[in-house]
């Protein structure tokens, strides 16, 4: 997948051989692209349960995941994690720790850098974006679904083992 060099959003492939560059919906035709962008996600905990979302679109459509997404150009990963949760599930989140940084390869062979945070929310009834999330549910650690996207189960297992470490007060240092 290719991403706009201005905003980091995924762009269509275009037809470069015919002189038609990939196009960003917001910034138009792009000849200069970035190959990948870092990702940030949040293991959201409330009363011992974790909020998971079922993907409404590819890749992994219909699979459960830890909510998150791409870090936009110039955005701090902490800010991206909070923004992605609000966009996908319509809830605010307070980040409380870092579960880990994962270096993975996507199904397309692209390098991924995924920062997984731990967070809490007081919201118990998310209002998800139906374009992103088809279903949501709170799961106890012994009830995590088996049909999870990519390596999301590994991230949840790391969180459950207590690997999250605290963040500085401003979440940046």
Outline where the language-model segments fall:
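Conserved Nudix-box catalytic region and its N-terminal flanking loop in Nudix hydrolases
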Residues: 45-87
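Charged phosphate-binding loop/patch that engages nucleotide di/tri-phosphates or the phosphate backbone
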Residues: 158-173
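NUDIX/MutT-family hydrolases
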Residues: 128-160
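Active-site-adjacent beta-strand/loop module that shapes the phosphate/pyrophosphate-binding cleft
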Residues: 102-125
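Acidic, metal-coordinating catalytic segment for phosphate/diphosphate chemistry
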Residues: 1-41
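Short, well-ordered beta-strand micro-motif
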Residues: 44, 116-120, 137-140
């Amino acid at each position: 997948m290719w991403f706009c060099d201005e905003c980091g959003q995924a762009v269509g492939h275009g037809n470069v051989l015919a002189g038609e560059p990939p196009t960003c919906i917001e910034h138009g035709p792009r000849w200069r692209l970035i190959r990948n962008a870092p990702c940030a996600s949040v293991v959201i905990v409330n009363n011992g349960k974790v909020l998971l979302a079922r993907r409404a679109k590819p890749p992994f459509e219909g699979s459960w995941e830890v909510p998150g997404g791409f870090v936009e150009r110039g955005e701090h990963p902490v800010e991206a994690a909070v923004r992605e949760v609000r966009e996908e599930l319509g809830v605010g989140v307070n980040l409380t720790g870092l579960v880990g940084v994962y270096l993975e390869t996507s199904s397309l062979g692209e390098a991924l850098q995924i920062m997984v945070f731990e967070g809490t929310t007081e919201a118990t009834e998310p209002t998800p974006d139906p374009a992103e999330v088809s279903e949501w549910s709170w799961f106890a650690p012994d009830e995590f679904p088996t049909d999870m996207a990519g390596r999301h189960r590994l991230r949840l297992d790391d969180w459950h083992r207590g690997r999250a470490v605290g963040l500085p007060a401003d979440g940046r240092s």
